[in-house]
Amino acid sequence: SGAQPKAAVVAGMVGVIAEINPKAVEVRHGQKWVDEVYTSLDELIPRIRQASANKEAVSLAYQGNIVDLWERLVTENIHVDLGSDQTSLHNPFAGGYYPVGLSFEEANRMMAEQPELFKEKVYESLRRHVKAINTMAARGMYFFDYGNAFLLESSRAGADILKPNGDFRYPSYVQDIMGPMFFDYGFGPFRWVCTSSDPKDLATTDAIALEVLEEIAKTAPAEIMGQLQDNIHWIREASKNNLVVGSQARILYADA
């Protein structure tokens, strides 16, 4: 979707996102939804180290296979704080997942001409995919499921994705992040759209939201102060990062 690189920059992080489809990379880079594009891991890895050392807020796209990226992060011993996966594994054999070892074009041909072999390649890739993630998690990375059937399809592939009791190794972001941090305290996703399509109207609504949040924060209990400060940061930074695609709209996880 392109939201991940923007989110990383807004949050002040170094975001690294893999995308195998060159057209998708070109579009997002052209829209300025990702800052830099790399086709070589030999060039990307030093850039990650540099950006981390300098504490940059920057998004880096790797035009290539996600498994190659994860495995290289393992061998290079790159520290990763947060990891996730957003491949469309609800549709693993018809374009939702591209297996490691095949180019974008090769995968598309095999998908159409040799579907059973392609399925085998997907499952082989998922086993390698999970192995690399498990290694990174053992080194301290927090990995979460994005609700995209990654855990389910990995289990079907025979990957090491289950705990001894049969539960998945990793939680979903709703279960482990959004629920405890937001929903349990009455915070929910509110959206508004400026039907005038005027950016000035969106700026006005941002200013109103910021004023309300700052007023609430003056007397808010400590257990929700972090959420409020995150929301204040979000509203302040949203317009600076050119997040609008289409309608002049905003989302805010506000306290109902």
PLM feature segments, named:
Residues 2-53, 85-131, 168-183:
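Catalytic or ion-translocation cores adjacent to nucleophile or general acid/base/metal-coordination motifs
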Residues 9-11, 74-78, 159-162:
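Short, solvent-exposed amphipathic alpha-helical segments in soluble enzyme
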Residues 17, 61, 82-85, 142-148:
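A structural signal for short, well-ordered beta-strand segments and their strand-loop junctions
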Residues 18, 41, 62, 66, ...:
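Active-site-proximal structural scaffolding
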Residues 22-23, 65-67, 87-90, 148-151:
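Short, glycine-/Ser/Thr-/acidic-enriched flexible segments
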Residues 54, 79, 139-140:
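Structured helix-beta-strand junction loops
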Residues 59-87, 94:
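Active-site/ligand-binding-proximal alpha/beta "capping" segment
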Residues 90-94, 99, 113-256:
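Active-site loops and adjacent core secondary-structure elements that bind or stabilize anionic groups
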